[in-house]
Amino acid sequence: MTNTQKAILAGGCFWGMQELIRKQPGVVSTRVGYTGGDVPNATYRNHGTHAEAVEIIYDPAVTDYRQILEFFFQIHDPTTKDRQGNDRGPSYRSAIFYTDDEQKRIALDTIADVEASGLWPGKVVTEVSPAGDFWEAEPEHQDYLQRYPNGYTCHYIRPGWKLPRRATSGS
Protein backbone atom coordinates (compact mmCIF):
# COMPACT_ATOMS: atom_id res chain seq x y z
CA MET A 1 0.00 0.00 0.00
CA THR A 2 1.54 3.27 -1.09
CA ASN A 3 -1.42 5.66 -1.16
CA THR A 4 -1.93 7.05 2.33
CA GLN A 5 -3.18 10.37 3.63
CA LYS A 6 -2.61 12.31 6.83
CA ALA A 7 -4.95 13.88 9.38
CA ILE A 8 -3.84 15.91 12.42
CA LEU A 9 -6.35 16.29 15.25
CA ALA A 10 -6.29 17.66 18.80
CA GLY A 11 -8.99 16.81 21.30
CA GLY A 12 -7.52 16.81 24.78
CA CYS A 13 -4.90 14.49 26.22
CA PHE A 14 -3.33 12.67 23.30
CA TRP A 15 -3.14 9.29 25.09
CA GLY A 16 -6.87 8.57 24.88
CA MET A 17 -7.28 10.08 21.42
CA GLN A 18 -4.50 7.90 20.03
CA GLU A 19 -5.80 4.72 21.66
CA LEU A 20 -9.29 5.02 20.16
CA ILE A 21 -8.29 6.35 16.73
CA ARG A 22 -5.60 3.69 16.17
CA LYS A 23 -8.30 0.98 16.28
CA GLN A 24 -10.40 2.46 13.48
CA PRO A 25 -10.58 0.63 10.14
CA GLY A 26 -8.16 2.12 7.62
CA VAL A 27 -5.86 3.74 10.18
CA VAL A 28 -2.34 2.65 9.26
CA SER A 29 -0.38 4.42 12.01
CA THR A 30 -0.61 7.14 14.64
CA ARG A 31 1.86 9.19 16.62
CA VAL A 32 1.32 11.82 19.26
CA GLY A 33 2.95 15.22 19.42
CA TYR A 34 2.58 18.96 19.68
CA THR A 35 1.36 21.37 17.01
CA GLY A 36 -0.42 24.66 16.45
CA GLY A 37 1.72 26.72 18.79
CA ASP A 38 4.71 28.96 19.15
CA VAL A 39 7.63 26.88 20.49
CA PRO A 40 10.10 25.20 18.11
CA ASN A 41 11.21 21.68 19.05
CA ALA A 42 8.31 21.38 21.48
CA THR A 43 8.49 18.88 24.34
CA TYR A 44 6.09 17.85 27.09
CA ARG A 45 7.84 20.18 29.55
CA ASN A 46 8.12 23.05 27.04
CA HIS A 47 5.35 23.15 24.45
CA GLY A 48 4.15 26.73 24.86
CA THR A 49 0.81 27.23 23.12
CA HIS A 50 0.92 23.96 21.16
CA ALA A 51 -1.96 21.51 21.43
CA GLU A 52 -1.46 17.85 22.27
CA ALA A 53 -2.35 16.23 18.95
CA VAL A 54 -2.45 12.95 17.06
CA GLU A 55 -1.03 12.54 13.58
CA ILE A 56 -3.04 9.87 11.77
CA ILE A 57 -1.88 8.08 8.62
CA TYR A 58 -4.80 6.36 6.94
CA ASP A 59 -5.66 4.39 3.82
CA PRO A 60 -8.24 6.36 1.79
CA ALA A 61 -9.36 3.13 0.10
CA VAL A 62 -10.68 1.98 3.51
CA THR A 63 -11.72 5.19 5.27
CA ASP A 64 -11.93 8.85 4.40
CA TYR A 65 -11.25 12.16 6.11
CA ARG A 66 -14.94 12.75 6.84
CA GLN A 67 -15.24 9.38 8.64
CA ILE A 68 -12.16 10.16 10.72
CA LEU A 69 -13.62 13.54 11.68
CA GLU A 70 -16.99 12.02 12.57
CA PHE A 71 -15.23 9.61 14.93
CA PHE A 72 -13.14 12.49 16.34
CA PHE A 73 -16.32 14.40 17.22
CA GLN A 74 -17.79 11.30 18.84
CA ILE A 75 -14.87 10.62 21.22
CA HIS A 76 -14.24 14.10 22.61
CA ASP A 77 -16.35 17.08 23.67
CA PRO A 78 -15.92 19.78 21.00
CA THR A 79 -17.98 22.30 22.98
CA THR A 80 -15.58 22.95 25.86
CA LYS A 81 -12.89 25.54 25.20
CA ASP A 82 -9.39 24.51 26.26
CA ARG A 83 -10.66 21.53 28.23
CA GLN A 84 -11.33 17.80 28.08
CA GLY A 85 -12.35 16.02 31.26
CA ASN A 86 -10.02 17.05 34.09
CA ASP A 87 -7.44 18.52 31.71
CA ARG A 88 -7.54 22.29 31.29
CA GLY A 89 -5.54 24.76 29.24
CA PRO A 90 -4.76 25.47 25.59
CA SER A 91 -2.81 22.21 25.29
CA TYR A 92 -6.14 20.38 25.56
CA ARG A 93 -8.13 22.40 23.04
CA SER A 94 -10.19 20.90 20.25
CA ALA A 95 -8.55 21.56 16.87
CA ILE A 96 -8.34 20.27 13.33
CA PHE A 97 -5.11 21.00 11.48
CA TYR A 98 -5.83 20.67 7.76
CA THR A 99 -3.19 19.80 5.16
CA ASP A 100 -5.00 21.19 2.10
CA ASP A 101 -8.09 23.14 1.03
CA GLU A 102 -10.17 19.97 0.63
CA GLN A 103 -9.50 18.95 4.25
CA LYS A 104 -10.44 22.47 5.36
CA ARG A 105 -13.72 22.27 3.40
CA ILE A 106 -14.56 18.86 4.86
CA ALA A 107 -13.67 20.04 8.38
CA LEU A 108 -15.94 23.10 8.17
CA ASP A 109 -18.75 21.03 6.65
CA THR A 110 -18.46 18.38 9.37
CA ILE A 111 -18.49 21.04 12.10
CA ALA A 112 -21.66 22.51 10.56
CA ASP A 113 -23.23 19.03 10.71
CA VAL A 114 -22.19 18.63 14.36
CA GLU A 115 -23.72 22.03 15.16
CA ALA A 116 -26.97 21.20 13.36
CA SER A 117 -27.25 17.72 14.87
CA GLY A 118 -27.79 18.74 18.49
CA LEU A 119 -25.65 15.76 19.57
CA TRP A 120 -23.57 18.08 21.75
CA PRO A 121 -25.24 20.51 24.18
CA GLY A 122 -23.29 23.62 23.23
CA LYS A 123 -21.63 25.45 20.37
CA VAL A 124 -18.66 23.72 18.74
CA VAL A 125 -15.42 25.55 19.62
CA THR A 126 -13.10 23.34 17.56
CA GLU A 127 -10.41 25.42 15.85
CA VAL A 128 -9.71 24.82 12.15
CA SER A 129 -6.17 25.85 11.24
CA PRO A 130 -3.57 25.00 8.61
CA ALA A 131 -1.16 22.25 9.63
CA GLY A 132 2.28 23.46 10.62
CA ASP A 133 5.22 21.80 12.29
CA PHE A 134 4.36 18.63 14.20
CA TRP A 135 6.79 17.94 17.02
CA GLU A 136 6.69 14.24 17.90
CA ALA A 137 6.18 13.66 21.63
CA GLU A 138 8.69 11.77 23.72
CA PRO A 139 8.72 7.94 23.52
CA GLU A 140 6.99 7.56 26.90
CA HIS A 141 3.90 9.29 25.44
CA GLN A 142 3.69 7.16 22.28
CA ASP A 143 1.21 4.28 22.53
CA TYR A 144 0.78 5.08 26.23
CA LEU A 145 -2.48 3.21 26.78
CA GLN A 146 -1.11 0.17 24.96
CA ARG A 147 1.55 -0.05 27.65
CA TYR A 148 -0.70 1.08 30.52
CA PRO A 149 -4.23 -0.15 29.67
CA ASN A 150 -5.63 1.25 32.93
CA GLY A 151 -3.90 4.60 32.46
CA TYR A 152 -5.67 7.96 32.43
CA THR A 153 -8.07 8.81 29.64
CA CYS A 154 -11.14 11.00 29.32
CA HIS A 155 -12.07 9.78 25.84
CA TYR A 156 -14.62 7.12 25.06
CA ILE A 157 -16.87 5.89 22.30
CA ARG A 158 -20.45 7.07 22.77
CA PRO A 159 -22.77 4.16 21.87
CA GLY A 160 -25.37 5.02 19.27
CA TRP A 161 -23.66 8.29 18.33
CA LYS A 162 -24.17 8.83 14.61
CA LEU A 163 -23.65 12.19 12.93
CA PRO A 164 -26.40 12.99 10.42
CA ARG A 165 -25.77 15.33 7.52
CA ARG A 166 -27.70 18.56 7.82
CA ALA A 167 -30.24 19.63 5.25
CA THR A 168 -28.78 22.29 2.98
CA SER A 169 -30.59 24.50 0.53
CA GLY A 170 -29.74 24.00 -3.11
CA SER A 171 -28.21 20.56 -2.76
Swiss-Prot record:
NCBIfam families: msrA. It comes from Mycolicibacterium paratuberculosis (strain ATCC BAA-968 / K-10) (Mycobacterium paratuberculosis). The keyword Oxidoreductase applies. Its EC number is 1.8.4.11. It is an enzyme of class 1 (oxidoreductase). Has an important function as a repair enzyme for proteins that have been inactivated by oxidation. Catalyzes the reversible oxidation-reduction of methionine sulfoxide in proteins to methionine. Keywords: Oxidoreductase. InterPro entries: Met_Sox_Rdtase_MsrA_dom (IPR002569), Met_Sox_Rdtase_MsrA_sf (IPR036509). It holds the Pfam family PMSR. The keyword Oxidoreductase applies. Gene3D superfamilies: Peptide methionine sulphoxide reductase MsrA. The active site is at C13. This is Peptide methionine sulfoxide reductase MsrA. SUPFAM superfamilies: Peptide methionine sulfoxide reductase. PANTHER family: PEPTIDE METHIONINE SULFOXIDE REDUCTASE, PEPTIDE METHIONINE SULFOXIDE REDUCTASE MSRA 2. GO terms for molecular function: L-methionine:thioredoxin-disulfide S-oxidoreductase activity; peptide-methionine (S)-S-oxide reductase activity. The gene is msrA. One of its GO terms (biological process) is protein modification process. Belongs to the MsrA Met sulfoxide reductase family. It catalyses: L-methionyl-[protein] + [thioredoxin]-disulfide + H2O = L-methionyl-(S)-S-oxide-[protein] + [thioredoxin]-dithiol; [thioredoxin]-disulfide + L-methionine + H2O = L-methionine (S)-S-oxide + [thioredoxin]-dithiol.
